[in-house]
């Protein structure tokens, strides 16, 4: 499943305990008149089918014991103990019915058994999955799908299928009074949050943006991270390590990777300390650090960046950039820039790609000339949330477009030393949180024996493995062994 990074683990009890505290922390306490925030429990329920067919997967023949002891306890705890205000229904089907149209899940279990009286909203596009050809195909059209979803208790849709509710009422597929039930829940929530009143009347609007990533919050996060770590084994009392003449080897594909620590559906932190950086900082002046990546995530290969072999037509290092405040590149660019390092652009946190460029509804074109100093296979590595295309010598060699978070895309080219290659990368984005990472490099096979030789004198080896958001993300296209995306 593409969003495993966001979960609290597979243990129903621990997930329940952590989830309840997160909900309480998010929602806070009512100030006497207004709620601070409404948290949402997701995705309800049995949402752990294969990523690649999530829009048509049917979770069936679930034994009652599995349902009530494995899949449902965290949701029940969030409703009964956490008093969560919202629940999101999942993409998949449950026992034949789409979760957002399941009376069993939304009416019998959630509302009748647990007493939930808040809002149920759909995952984005989930109602359209009822009738789309590449979805469940349980309903013939948007009118039937939207009527069924509302009647099953889905009050709010992330999407546009509910626009058909007017016609559904006219066709007699649903009574207007049933729609009124959902509308009442939605308006009740908005009144509770103070959305219908002047901002100055709502105490929560006085919280300044400056608290985000503030020194106090950073300190608390660090303290929480330290106190929440669990040491499972300490064979021969290896820990704590003693400084002074210590040689530490740090290995693994995630050792020097910031993105690995962010998860997915993440904000962009103002700074990140990689595990390699953290160990380096912790060592004393008499200690020695050896960094040897040693392997990739799933392949016996590493990418050695050759971004420094790229120059623009006028001889400047890196890529020239042109930006438009529209997605069609109409008119003259609003600004130009020179990008001298591998791309790490993201609009999260209201950070623009360049001064004067929109946060949404913008496009960009990057150009450079790549002149390799050796022959071999060069990988053009793209990780993007948005749409675009890569051209080499005027020919489009790779296109990309995605709707949910970052997507990894790559193109491999056999190059000759001294030959020039015109590189052009287009990018455009309509919504918020645009993301574009780009680099190029030679793909070198990992020689495990050489890596072992380089770290043989280390007193201890710290290996940092696991997966990464570069491998695992929602509806993320992955072209690597062992992953179907």
Describe every region a protein language model picked out.
Residues 1-485:
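Glycoside hydrolase catalytic-domain context in secreted enzymes
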